[in-house]
């Protein structure tokens, strides 16, 4: 964690599809201790599972699910609030109603939550289904931030449409001044290899040039062989993309 922070990690995401509360609590403590040693603040995102079914090692939306927020999510939310996590991210949102339901659940557990506009936790919507794309503007309006989960989205729409969905979501988030994280398989090859592919580097740069506020690693840092190298590559590409933007804007 010390090395990840030193090489460019700004936010940590905890995937509540996996792991025990005991393991998550230890990881939260370790993240905060490492951030303190570095003189940094590292916000933590609690990524709720949502209505998933598992096939082998992958998860996807349960099509029979009526409610996006499950009983497991509510138990996980209680844990996240007890740990004072900075962001709660709801998976598989389809409309503003799903986001508002999560906010209501937070308010029910902490009546003072609504009284402070700057208070945590912030509510993040994960966009990863066609219905969310159809309702993207109302979802952004209802959320404090958005995460684009391209993996599950690519199962719900034709995969060739994913880059254009990404551009559309980022555009609307920038227009409405809401932070947007682009996620999934950004440096997938670095799970097993110390260097990225040219296509992966281009993918990261594309997201930044579109206007994404953050790009996210998952497997690369959760179970990959080269987590620090992956963060280092991502940091370098982001800085180059931002430099390019400044040069273009100066013309």
Annotate each PLM feature.
Residues 1-251:
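Non-catalytic helical/linker scaffolds that mediate oligomerization, partner binding
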């Amino acid at each position: 964690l010390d090395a990840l922070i030193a090489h460019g990690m700004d936010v940590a995401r905890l995937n509540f599809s996996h792991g025990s509360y005991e393991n998550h609590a230890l990881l939260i403590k370790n993240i905060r201790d490492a951030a303190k040693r570095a003189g940094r603040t590292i916000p933590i995102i609690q990524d709720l599972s949502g209505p998933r079914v598992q096939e082998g090692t992958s998860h996807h939306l349960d099509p029979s699910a009526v409610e996006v927020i499950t009983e497991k999510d509510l138990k996980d939310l209680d844990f996240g609030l007890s740990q004072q996590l900075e962001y709660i991210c709801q998976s598989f949102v389809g409309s503003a109603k799903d986001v508002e339901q999560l906010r209501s659940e937070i308010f029910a557990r902490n009546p003072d939550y609504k009284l402070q506009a700057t208070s945590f936790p912030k509510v993040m919507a994960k966009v990863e289904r066609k219905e969310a794309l159809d309702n993207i503007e109302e979802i952004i309006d209802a959320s404090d931030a958005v995460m684009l989960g391209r993996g599950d989205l690519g199962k719900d729409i034709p995969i060739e449409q994913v880059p254009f969905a990404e551009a559309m979501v980022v555009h609307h988030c920038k227009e409405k001044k809401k932070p947007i994280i682009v996620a999934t398989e950004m440096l997938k090859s670095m799970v097993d290899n110390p260097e990225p592919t040219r296509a992966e580097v281009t993918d990261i740069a594309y997201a930044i040039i579109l206007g994404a506020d953050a790009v996210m690693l998952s497997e690369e840092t959760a179970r990959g062989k080269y987590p620090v190298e992956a963060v280092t590559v991502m940091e370098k590409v982001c800085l180059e993309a931002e430099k390019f933007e400044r040069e273009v804007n100066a013309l």
